[in-house]
């Protein structure tokens, strides 16, 4: 606190150290061994997250402290505004720690930002603090003993509750949203990349420009919290609010008005006009992760203003600059028409996929479900009936008609992914070429995708790591894939039991299902599942099968042949 105004660089560095110390205290309290390999602060946080001990909001604060500490050490970061924002967030972090690992009945006093004292009386301060240390040490011993009587599960539940009751200011929320936007490919810094400080759209940069002025009379004198630009194209408006605000109402009462009120001098940045709207996409958020229980007060709410039929919906993460440009290129009505008018001759070709009637029927059922607007689709086909070839044919038609831009083929074990890769490479489908010669396919060994990628084969485990325990400073965009095809995901936990302890991602079957569902629901995509034996959690996510082909039918058809 004493450094916040006099030496912001030192303040940022020491706040980061506080975050490190707090994590080490949790390890000691929970009797958890620190990682034997790559024992870094970031990896220790990931380990505690896997144990369910670090809620999302706490993780966001710890990330901000760690990132800014590194910037302070290596880049000389010394923003007083950042130091003040992080100081108040760190106070909230300390309160959370006290509520979980100290006194469960603790009621924290309001945080008071320290004044810029030019020459403090250090001797008096030291004497006062030494007296406090003696008194507090006795209290700490008592409350720590009380907290240690609780189980780790109880503390995890308490930690989640305490983090959700934490109220961040709008400035703190904006700071965390800056960090989130940067993870998804946007340049964002509320304190420096502001309209009032001369920041304007530039070719080759993806800028989230803060406090963008509009002619709207709503909100803060018509200033949008962020305007999103891909190069010099205005593609989105973002409003950031405190946790207590109903987020969808912000889209109706503010975001839409900002999208209508783009100033005449900024018309050069607009792409088109959709009715009264001059911006295609709007977002509203309070920085809190999406929770179904408090749906309207969590998540990132998004609305595509290009059609009045679109309704606001909650997203699990942000859309990247590339993702928004791909959204602009979509024409679902035209793609559905192309899909319906594409014949099945290639899929029946004996020199190609050579699909049988029931496999064509499965694809037809899947396509009709998509045209009808279903977001989740389940196909049930008995073992040995050629699910992988059916999937290949279905994916080919969806991409060929441009109904979907990029497909995630998600498997529960490496062997299934390798099997799919082999089929995609070997089976001829068009002009005697296999799918991987027609479209860009990324295999199991490739984590990153690019604009040209059409199919990405990945395991559930790899996506859990990328989404829940990311190792770098980037996150997958929620629109990286617009179709997810899941093959036999119900067996994933059985395979994971065979992993070594250091590789374990799931504590038990319920934890596997929870994380599996998180991966599935993270992306704003149509989701398909193909399975021989639908598990309960599979039908809970995907619904009842739109197509069912049993062993009995397969045997009967084979006999007829």
Model region roles, listed by residue range:
Residues 554-561:
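Conserved small/polar residues in nucleotide/adenosyl-binding loops
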Residues 543-553:
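A short helix-turn-beta junction within AAA+ P-loop NTPase domains corresponding to the substrate/partner-engaging
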Residues 488:
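Walker B catalytic acidic pair
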Residues 383, 512-538:
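Conserved helicase ATPase motor motifs in RecA-like P-loop NTPase domains
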Residues 443-456:
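Conserved motor-coupling elements within RecA-like helicase/translocase cores
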Residues 98-406, 415, 419-430, 452-455, ...:
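ATP-dependent helicase/translocase motor core
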Residues 1-130:
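Amphipathic alpha-helical interface elements
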Residues 456-483, 493-513:
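Conserved RecA-like ASCE ATPase "motif II neighborhood" in helicase/translocase motors
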